[in-house]
């Protein structure tokens, strides 16, 4: 299995530990950055990873930031990505079984033993292929296909203070 992984500066230590852990389990791991604890903005890394998942260059992705929230929001802007911010093994199981999530977002402050358990459950749980879940995913895909474009005409967010 091929896994993409990315983080911001706060998720970097956890990302590095996960790379070692996954490599020992014989996963092929592609690191999309960042490469240090120097402060960075997570969207750049989330978008790169999301594109690799959406384009089927990898089977799954893992993103890590301080809370897992911001980087998951950024990942979910990539068409075809279903990124779930997960805090426990039950959520890891359900997001795969019910939502067919293809990217796992983690809190960089979470204990490593918990992170490893969550990752193991996420990768070892299959989508259930139940009609109601398939229908929900298809509704999301249809919305993406009809409403999400590569470039938006929105004004850039600015802080004029």
Please give the residue ranges for each predicted region.
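C-terminal binding/interaction regions
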Residues: 6, 10-13, 89-161
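Helix-adjacent hinge/juxtasegments
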Residues: 45, 49-85
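Structural motif
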Residues: 6, 32, 64-65, 86, ...
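A short beta-strand-loop structural module common to alpha/beta enzyme folds
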Residues: 28-39
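Short amphipathic alpha-helical segments
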Residues: 16-19, 73-77, 117
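Glycine-rich phosphate/diphosphate-binding loop of Rossmann-like nucleotide-binding domains
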Residues: 4-24
